């Protein structure tokens, strides 16, 4: 009977540790979800700003005529 009580106590202790671990992991998932939402919003804003950028009137270096050599 004592052995059965010890086994039950061990199981209760494991359950308590598992509950603590699950709560800790849940908090981490919540933080990561908030971070992901923030990053998605920043990406959306950057994409919007990038689509509004006008093309430059300056020719690329490959299109420029080389300077005269003396």
From Swiss-Prot:
Coiled-coil segments on the chain, per record: none
InterPro entries: SlyX
Family annotation (SUPFAM superfamilies): Tropomyosin
Pfam family, one: SlyX
Family, similarity comment: Belongs to the SlyX family.
Full protein name: Protein SlyX homolog
């Amino acid at each position: 009977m004592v052995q059965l009580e010890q086994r039950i106590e061990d199981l209760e202790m494991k359950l308590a540790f598992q509950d603590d671990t699950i709560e800790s992991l849940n908090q981490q998932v919540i933080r990561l979800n908030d971070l992901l939402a923030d990053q998605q919003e920043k990406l959306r804003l950057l994409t919007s700003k990038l689509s509004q950028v006008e093309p430059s009137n300056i020719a690329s270096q490959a299109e420029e005529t080389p300077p005269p050599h003396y």
